[in-house]
């Protein structure tokens, strides 16, 4: 799916949490904000800064511990209006996008429109 950026977005998290499937997590508070982004949790993983992880990526074991159900990176893209992006996945109000150059990352869906 191709998108065009409609509003600038700047990441506030320079050190995004990056998880590997099966990696242990400590799940903290649920994000509550005016944006309406549902089911994001502040999580910690060994050796990393805390970061937000969407509920579908958080699994629970029989003892109540948490783990990553898939590989995941919380990297957000810095984008500007008019910029084209290729969307790979949407999750909980965000799109994982690939810019024309540079690394992929998350952008809020509210700052995107479908191209074409």
Language-model features: locations:
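Src homology 3 (SH3)-mediated interaction modules
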Residues: 1-116
């Amino acid at each position: 799916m191709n998108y065009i950026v409609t509003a600038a977005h700047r990441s506030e998290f320079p050190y995004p949490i990056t998880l590997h499937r099966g990696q242990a997590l400590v799940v903290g508070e649920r994000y509550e904000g005016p944006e309406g982004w549902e089911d994001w949790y502040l999580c910690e993983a060994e050796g990393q800064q805390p970061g937000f992880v969407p509920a579908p990526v958080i699994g629970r074991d029989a003892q109540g511990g948490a783990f990553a159900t898939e590989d995941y990176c919380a990297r957000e893209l810095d984008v500007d209006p008019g910029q084209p992006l290729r969307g790979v996945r949407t999750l909980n109000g965000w799109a994982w996008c690939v810019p024309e150059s540079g690394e992929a990352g998350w952008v809020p869906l509210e700052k995107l429109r479908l191209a074409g």
